Amino acid sequence: MVYYPYYEDIKMSVKQVIIMRKDLNMRKGKMIAQACHATMKNLLDHSYTNIDLSIAPFLSIELDDDVREWLQSGFTKICLYVDSEADLYTAYQVARDAGLRVSMIEDNGTTEFNGVKTNT
């Protein structure tokens, strides 16, 4: 998942791109859960925090300008698919190398994937 600046009518707006693996044939609910994990992980990974996550009621996050704009402009997301784990890694590396904010989700395999940790 990445936050991606998108040019529209000469005005730059921030959109979030979520990339999912098609080859896993995840149930719809599982896909939604993984996308939600990705959104939250990316937000927390790329915010300025001085928090102990075990004290969730006191969560305090400082947002940079891009994240603030994304939150204030409606949380726009673009969802894409890749055909394989290799394609997911390639997309991740290309986005990271371009300076975009990226996060990878590794599922524990508790409800799907036969107990095997899997990058979704």
Which residue stretches match the model-derived regions?
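Positively charged, small/polar-rich N-terminal and surface patches that mediate targeting and assembly
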Residues: 1-120
